[in-house]
Amino acid sequence: MSLIEIDGSYGEGGGQILRTAVGMSALTGEPVRIYNIRANRPRPGLSHQHLHAVKAVAEICDAECEGLEIGSTEIVFEPGKVKGGEYEVDIGTAGSVTLLLQAVKLAAIAADGPVEMEVRGGTDVKWSPPVDYEINVNAHYLDRLGYRYELEVLRRGHYPRGGGIVRARMEPPKRLKPLEAVKFGELESVRGISHCVRLPPHVAERQAKAASEIIERELGIRPEIEIETYPKGRDPHLGPGSGIVLWAEDDQGNRIGADALGEKGKPAEVVGREAAEQLVQRLRTGMALDEHMGDQILPFLAIADGESVFGVTGVDPHLPTNAWVVEKFLPVSVEIRGKEGEPATVEVRPEG
C-alpha cells in the first residue's frame, strides 16, 4: 500500500496541516502518513484538540489509524468510505469546535448522505474562527460553491472551561462551483453579533457601541450589531466570556469578517474597537476575502468544477501551507501572487 507522505513541520507547521491532510485523505480515499507533527511547537505532537479532530474524521469514514495518542508526532490514516449519519464528539476541553469542523466538513463532501454532528468544546476561543464567523462568513462562501453547511449554537464555550455545544449539518454536494471573487465591490452593509455570557449585559453593549462608532466614522455606514446576553439565573453557560464578530458585505455577495475576544482585564471598548479596526483595515485592501477565509476555502476550490481566482486581504501563513498539502492529494496547481502578510490574488486550477 502506498501512502501519501506529509511532513507536519512544513511551512506554518501547526495543526492546520494535520486537519487538511486528514480531511483530504477521507475525501480522496488516499491513505496518508503525517510525521513531524507540530515538531516546532513548544509541546510537539498531537494535542487533545488535534486528537479529537482526527478521531472525528476517522469515525465518519471508518478509518484505520496508527499513532493516535496525545504527544504523538506521527500518524497513519487509512480511510474507508465516508458515511452520512448522526455523530457526537466531545472535545472535553475548550478545544475549538470550528477547527475540528474544518477537517470534518472537507471529508463530508464524499459522504453518501448528510452528515450531522454535535460537537462539544470551545465556540469562542483564541487562535480559531469564532462560531459566528463560521456561520456568517465561512458557511456563506461554501453555500456559494454549492455546499450546504449549517450550524446551530446550543451553548457557547469559552476558555478555560469550554462546554459549548454546536450542531452541524453538512449536505454533500453533487459538484462544487468555482469561485471568482477578486475585488470587494461597493459596501452594502456591516453586520455583527456582540455577546457575553456569565457577565453583565453592558459588556456586550459596550463592545457593540465601540465597534459601531469606528465603523460609522471610518466607513460612513451604520452597522447592525445584534446584542446577545443572558439574564442572571437563566444563563446555561459555564463562562464567563465575551466576544464580537463583524462582517461587511458588498453588492456582489462577498463578505469580509473580523473578530475580537474579551479577556480578563481587557475593557469591552477595547474588544469592540479591535474588531472594528481590523475590519476597516481589511476593507481598505480592496480584496474580496479576508486572510482567514482565503486559506479555509482553498481545499474546496481544489475539487471545484473549473478554475477559481480570488483576492485575499493578506496572505496568512496557513495559505501556502494548505496549498502544499492539497497539491499532495490532487492534480491541482495553486498560484499565490503576493507576499506573506500582504494582499494577494490566488489562482486555483484543478487539472483532473
Swiss-Prot record:
Location relative to the cell? Cytoplasm
Q: Which transformation does this protein catalyse, written as a reaction?
A: a 3'-end 3'-phospho-ribonucleotide-RNA + ATP = a 3'-end 2',3'-cyclophospho-ribonucleotide-RNA + AMP + diphosphate
Return the Pfam families for the record: RTC (PF01137), RTC_insert (PF05189)
Biological role: Catalyzes the conversion of 3'-phosphate to a 2',3'-cyclic phosphodiester at the end of RNA. The mechanism of action of the enzyme occurs in 3 steps: (A) adenylation of the enzyme by ATP; (B) transfer of adenylate to an RNA-N3'P to produce RNA-N3'PP5'A; (C) and attack of the adjacent 2'-hydroxyl on the 3'-phosphorus in the diester linkage to produce the cyclic end product. The biological role of this enzyme is unknown but it is likely to function in some aspects of cellular RNA processing.
GO CC entries: cytoplasm
HAMAP family (UniProt xref):
RTC
The entry's keywords: ATP-binding, Cytoplasm, Ligase, Nucleotide-binding
Q: Give any single GO term for biological process.
A: RNA processing
What Gene Ontology terms describe what this protein does at the molecular function level?
A: ATP binding; RNA-3'-phosphate cyclase activity
Query: What EC identifiers does the entry list?
Result: 6.5.1.4
InterPro entries attached here?
RNA3'-term_phos_cycl_insert, RNA3'_phos_cyclase_dom, RNA3'_phos_cyclase_dom_sf, RNA3'_term_phos_cyc, RNA3'_term_phos_cyc_type_1, RNA3'_term_phos_cycl-like_CS, RNA3'P_cycl/enolpyr_Trfase_a/b, RPTC_insert
Superkingdom of the source species: Archaea
Catalytic residues (positions):
H318
Q: Where is ATP bound in this sequence?
A: Q102, H292, M293, G294, D295, Q296
Q: What is this protein called?
A: RNA 3'-terminal phosphate cyclase
- Family under the similarity heading: Belongs to the RNA 3'-terminal cyclase family. Type 1 subfamily.
